[in-house]
């Protein structure tokens, strides 16, 4: 995957909050947090460079880019974190002002006809059949029309975390995504 575009933008958007959360959650001083962030950037670029390009219709590219950033920071820390503090670190680092705006905006369309159509397209795409760092999912629409469930059968985050030797920390990403979703829905 090319660094320019979304990966570079995500680094610009989130690296400062990642650095701040190194201090808040893990107790690193400002110099150590700066050192970790400085070491994480070339690692992040390397991780991104080793990922294949995502298809234009693949809606999960951002998830993989964010996972790459978290992995780069973890691999740059002097001590491997535990899942629980890493969960808080990632959730807090991702919940920036622009992300809160994005959550409010996207939350207004959840379960709409347009959202459901996009989910059907995602299910049909089966992008992980061609890219091991993407996702495949099965969509289960509720018979009463009240919503749906997406059950993932292939997980790009799991694949990348295994590659990075961080698979045991994968629950931190999923738990933090749930925390972020709750924060987003409570602010909508």
Residue ranges of model-derived segments:
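C-terminal, beta-strand-rich globular interaction domains
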Residues: 169-173, 183-188
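N-terminal accessory segment detector
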Residues: 1-147, 156-174
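Active-site-proximal segments of catalytic enzyme domains
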Residues: 178-180
């Amino acid at each position: 995957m090319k660094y320019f575009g979304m990966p570079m933008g995500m680094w610009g958007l989130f690296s400062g909050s990642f650095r701040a959360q190194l201090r808040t959650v893990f107790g690193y001083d400002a110099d150590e947090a700066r050192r970790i962030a400085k070491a994480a950037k070339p690692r992040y670029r390397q991780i991104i460079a080793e990922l294949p390009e995502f298809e234009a219709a693949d809606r999960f590219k951002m998830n993989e880019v964010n996972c790459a950033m978290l992995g780069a920071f973890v691999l740059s820390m002097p001590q491997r974190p535990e899942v629980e503090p890493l969960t808080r670190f990632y959730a807090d680092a991702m919940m920036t002002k622009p992300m809160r705006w994005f959550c409010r905006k996207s939350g207004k369309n959840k379960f709409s006809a347009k959202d459901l159509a996009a989910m059907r397209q995602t299910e049909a795409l089966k992008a992980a059949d061609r890219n091991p760092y993407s996702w495949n999912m099965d969509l289960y629409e509720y018979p009463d029309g009240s919503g749906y469930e997406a059950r993932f059968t292939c997980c790009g985050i799991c694949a990348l975390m295994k590659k990075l030797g961080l698979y045991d920390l994968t629950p931190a990403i999923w738990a933090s995504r749930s925390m972020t979703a709750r924060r987003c829905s409570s602010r909508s």
